[in-house]
Amino acid sequence: MNKFLSNRGYSLIELVVVIVIIGILATITLRSMSGTNSVARVEQTTRQLERIAHAIAGDPNLVSGGVRANYGYIGDVGGLPPDLDALVANPGGYTTWKGPYIQDELTPDATNTRFKLDGWGQAISYSGGATVSSSGGGSSIITRSLASTVTALLRNRVTVSITDLAGVPPGTIYRDSVKALFDIPNGAGGVTTKIEFPSRDGFLTYDSITIGQHLLRIVYTPENDTLRRQVHVDPGTVVPIDIQLFRKVW
């Protein structure tokens, strides 16, 4: 008995079912890819905001000799940058500017401007305050703080106690024989030297000090002896400095 092979094709219903299944699988795949791509863009943006924050206010994780070694643009210039371009180009012939403070990742170009774009290719927002942010591709804003407040970056305090080798403060008679000179960047491209004389108990205070590493000089004027100390000022701090002169002088 001869057997006949069926050459019947697929029915319309079967074709529709196959097409529907393919469509469902394609939708699932696209959604998965879209979700993965979105996560990657968020991660890229978060990393970019952190790099910009470190360029402006320094990286607290960069330490040398047990002390913080990096304070970014603010530490050098003494003020917030007017815009992100000031991180890669001197904003006005500032002698204290030591940039560029940031470089484009992977493929830096001559303009060095890609760092200003988030993971969606949109401009990162910075208006001279204590945060940088991204629109997050229109879904949700992504923000990175430079510090708790602008005050924490620009208005810290340094207190100084001065005694001689015997631990004796200058008193009323000798308080004018010693002076403290504190060199700090003034925010306009130069350096300001703040001069103070101690109280009779040997204390003096400097206010409105920006973050950074600043030079403090203590001068015993009768002999013009000078003691130098590098002062590290972190955000939102009061920095106590104890100075003892080289010998008994009072």
Regions found by a protein language model. Give the residues of each.
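N-terminal single-pass transmembrane signal-anchor helix
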Residues: 2, 6-37, 41, 48
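Membrane-proximal N-terminal amphipathic helix
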Residues: 38-67
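Short, glycine/small-hydrophobic-rich surface segments
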Residues: 56-112
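A short, amphipathic beta-strand motif
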Residues: 156-166
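Short, ordered, surface-exposed loop/turn motifs in non-cytosolic proteins
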Residues: 166-190
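Short, acidic Ser/Thr/Gly-rich low-complexity loop/linker segments typical of extracellular
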Residues: 185-204
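A short, solvent-exposed beta-strand micro-motif common in secreted/extracellular proteins
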Residues: 210-224
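Structured interaction patches on ligand/partner-binding surfaces of diverse proteins
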Residues: 221-250
